[in-house]
Amino acid sequence: MAIQIRPQFHPITPFIGAEVDGIDLREPLAPEQIAAIDDAMDRYAVLVFHDQPLTNDQHLAFTRSLGPIETSTGNKLRKPEDIRLPTTFADVSNLDGNNKPYARNDRKRLFAIGNRLWHSDSSFKAIPAKYSLLRALSVPSKGGNTEFAHMGAAYEALDDATKALIEPLICEHSQMFSRDLIGFREFSPEERERFKPVRQRLVRTLPRTGRKSIYLSSHAGTIVGWEMPEARLLLRDLSEHATQREFVYSHKWRVDDLVMWDNRQTMHRGRPFPVEEARDVRRTTISGDAPTAAQVDDARTQAVAA
């Protein structure tokens, strides 16, 4: 039987994040509870649930109550013997198939540390993600925080001229763009095909509230119709603006935390931690509803991907 207690939300910062009390995510949720969570996501963008010792099945059940699950492609970067989770999860741990930390020079680890760059999950997909739900099973002794930036608050702090400038702009997103920033450039032909750039609007509007946000990510490598140097400088300026400390919440993980965030109005990044220590965190992702921009498979896009 669904528990009817309404969750309580306690703001963490003036702009972003709330801690949630009065809800046990191991139990099926009533429609009123789901509606309260959706409303809170629109308002706070990041929700923190402490002391939620979920099984994988319970994690999946909670996710499905909020929307359809996006299939993860991360296992394609792992060796078969290192796959720990089904594709309903994104395994964003630093662990191999024996639950041991990857070696410092392991290719999967070097690709994964690109997550230390500010990004929005799945902005490199034609239909980008809506919510992400990350759960901690083990945490390192120090470091490993996840930081979140509120892109709606950042948009509202822009001057009118900048808002007008970016309103019509379309960016191209690819994981190859973000990995290039850290010097990771060795991709197979199959990976280059899979990571072809997709187009996303630079300004998004939340459908239920009408609130606008900067839709930005380290995956964004250029702006359609702009010269590359000018495009990247504008994207850098916007990222520096959006990640000022006033717009950012840094989450220090505890075992059995579940943190969910709205990718449509946030960026996030992981922080460093000792390479020899385990950080077992696993994520489910809720699919978005539609593309933000038309996809044009033209010669220019193909050239950017090469």
Each language-model region and where it sits:
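Fe(II)/2-oxoglutarate oxygenase catalytic core
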Residues: A2-M260, R264-A306
